[in-house]
Design a protein with these regions (language model features):
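N-terminal signal-anchor transmembrane segment
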Residues: 1-64, 83-89, 379-381
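Flexible juxtamembrane loops connecting transmembrane helices in multi-pass membrane enzymes
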Residues: 159-162, 236-249, 259-298, 320
Length: 439
């Protein structure tokens, strides 16, 4: 089933590229498609992410911005990425040297977006990410209702099974559903669209039983709240910017109603949710298979970390530690990354990985008041349990988080910016230049 989804995904992307390049507004269309590709997992051509290929094609299109002021971010990012990738040549336990090339390709793709993305490009990319996340969630709901054939995971965890959507496993579905929840809440949408997008992603975020996504969402909300308090305490009182609140109350009401109906119709679901939430607090129980596996893997990674030289064991070395903590020293292991991105990168690169780790965390915190910054924070927290740092989504969010703070210096003020957004139009996810706060 996974191969079928990947095949359909690859064919759809290729056909979409052909259609986009013949579209009158092909730059906006390809920007949207770039956001869609960032929401896919494992769609590659000769081990090159479709996201990277589309970024190169997108660079060749006319138009866009010239964001010269972003170079101060790209220089440290490029240095950190090259330093970490160099461990593929130095490490003694490198499992797949091509992972270094994939990383450099993703960083290069992010650099392209940073240097050339305009406000409208960024908006289109976020829309593409929202659409593909919601499609994945919709497929997950159809799997739960048996309308799409699939093998539901972990019936011992959930009485109705854990859907996978268009992704290889439920944890990834949960992460992308969380991305969809944040985007549908923050972006300006018509009331009906906000309800549909929010409800679809929220329901799947719950039904996927992905604890990493739950923790990440709560952690992101707490950091956003802390940032808001700090900002108000350190800045003069001014006109308060109101976000796109249209439809939020309706979305909350729909989520409450749908939850009540689901819990009433399937009483076992309530017990499953309570038990799943309880496993996030306190000691991991013996029957918590995924929790026990994560503990064993982290223990093995810690043991491996005790022996790292200054440049680590080499990028992808952490992948030699299996899901249950077994260490595969000979041959090529199936995985190339660890579940915990920070611990895995330390095993891979040790001090050579620290600059990249520090850059990602710092960028997420500095941009926590923007939409891309909040999404990046969510993905990084989730990646402490299910590593998505080597996925395109992390790097498009890195690029958009950088440009979220630089946008006002990059492109001329357009007539739309000076006159306001026309009635019925969807506002940009970034504030106009006169704004005193990030969205």
């Amino acid at each position: 089933m996974e191969s079928l989804y990947l095949g359909f995904g690859s064919a759809a992307v290729i056909l979409s590229v052909v259609a986009v390049l013949t579209h009158p507004d092909r730059r906006s269309a390809l920007s949207f498609l770039l956001g869609v590709s960032a929401g896919l997992v494992g769609v590659q051509v000769f081990r090159i992410h479709i996201f990277t290929i589309l970024a190169v094609i997108w660079l060749c299109l006319p138009g866009g911005a010239v964001n010269r002021s972003s170079a101060k971010f790209l220089a440290p990012l490029g240095f950190a990425a090259v330093l970490f990738a160099s461990t593929a040549l130095l490490g003694d336990l490198v499992n797949s040297p091509t992972l270094a090339l994939q990383l450099l390709g993703l960083v290069g793709s992010a650099a392209i977006v940073v240097l050339r993305a305009s406000r409208e490009d960024a908006k289109a990319m976020l829309w593409g990410l929202l659409v593909i996340s919601t499609i994945g969630s919709a497929v997950g709901l159809l799997q739960v209702f048996k309308l799409v054939p699939s093998d539901l995971w972990h019936l011992q965890i959930s009485a109705i099974g854990r859907p996978t959507g268009i992704y290889p496993e439920p944890d990834w579905l949960g992460m992308y559903a969380g991305v969809g929840v944040i985007l549908s809440w923050r972006l300006a949408l018509p009331r009906v669209a906000k309800v549909v997008f929010s409800l679809t992603n929220f329901m799947v975020l719950v039904l996927a039983m992905a604890r990493a996504s739950w923790v990440a969402l709560v952690g992101t909300l707490l950091l956003v709240a802390c940032a808001a308090v700090i900002y108000r305490g350190t800045h003069a009182v001014g006109p308060r910017l109101k976000g796109p609140r249209k439809g939020r109350l309706a979305a909350i009401a729909a989520a409450v109603l749908a939850s009540a109906v689901a819990l009433t119709a399937v009483p076992q679901l309530q017990e499953d949710l309570v038990r799943r939430i309880s496993t996030m607090i306190g000691t991991v129980q013996e029957d918590d298979i995924s929790g026990q596996a994560r503990i064993r893997q982290n223990d093995s990674l810690m043991a491996l970390a005790d022996t790292v030289p200054v440049y680590g064991h080499g990028i992808s070395a952490a992948g030699r530690v299996g899901a249950w903590g077994q260490f595969e020293a000979v041959g090529e292991a199936q995985n190339n990354v660890a579940s915990n991105w920070i611990l895995g990168m330390w095993v891979d690169g040790a001090w050579f990985a620290v600059p990249l780790i520090a850059f990602l965390i710092t960028l997420a915190l500095v941009r926590i008041r923007t939409i891309p910054g909040q999404l990046l924070t969510f993905c990084l927290i989730s990646s402490l349990f299910s590593n998505a740092v080597f996925f395109p989504i992390t790097w498009i969010l890195v690029a958009l988080a950088i440009t979220a703070g630089q946008r006002r210096h990059s492109t001329p003020v357009t007539e739309q910016e000076t006159a306001g957004v026309p009635a019925g139009a969807v506002p940009r996810p970034y504030p106009p230049r006169a704004a005193v706060a990030q969205p």
